[in-house]
UniProtKB/Swiss-Prot annotation:
Gene3D superfamilies: Inorganic pyrophosphatase. This is Inorganic pyrophosphatase. It is found in: Cytoplasm. Belongs to the PPase family.
Length: 175
């Protein structure tokens, strides 16, 4: 099924869909979903051997500054499976740039109805400094051994900035 058939969400930017490409703590393989067919393709093997610190995916029918859909890390009590759709709400974002342009990573949790374990989380501070440090370190280093690739982490952004990223991503997709 084409991911173009999956809506960006019920109440953008407060309640949005994320399609999971990489489960939390899975083997260091970067998967990319083909947006037309819905199939997952191996994009590359992560040379640093690092594991994604949270589930990683994208908001369908969005377009971010790097020309890809808006990226999202989804913090959950258990890893999710490749290709599943999970309704989320954002806590903030990691602002960064890479060789393709602006490449922000939203940090989100499932909507409260889906996960009582994360319902108390209202901003980035609620996921804990250790996980924030792991996320930042992962994205600073995961491309370190790949020729021609680089990442510059610019810091954290709050919910308002993350909401703007989502709204802009939906608008860019519709252009």
């Amino acid at each position: 099924m084409s991911f173009n058939n999956v809506s960006p969400g019920k109440d953008i930017p407060n309640d949005f869909n994320v399609i999971i490409e990489i489960p939390a703590q899975s083997d260091p393989v970067k998967y990319e979903a083909d947006k037309e067919t819905g199939l997952l393709h191996v994009d590359r093997f992560v040379g640093t051997g690092m594991r994604y610190p949270a589930n990683y995916g994208f908001i369908p029918q969005t377009l971010a500054g790097d020309g890809d859909p808006v990226d999202v890390l989804v913090v959950t009590p258990f890893p999710l499976v490749h290709g599943c759709v999970v309704r989320c709400r954002t806590l903030g974002m990691l602002k960064m740039t890479d060789e393709s342009g602006q490449d922000a990573k939203l940090v989100a949790v499932p909507v409260n109805k889906l996960s009582p374990a994360t319902a108390h989380m209202t901003d980035l501070s609620d996921i804990g400094q250790n996980l924030l440090d792991q996320i930042k370190h992962f994205f600073e280093q995961y491309k370190a051994l790949e020729p021609g690739k680089w990442v510059k982490v610019e810091g954290w952004g709050g919910i308002e900035e993350a909401h703007k990223e989502i709204v802009d991503g939906v608008a860019n997709y519709k252009k």
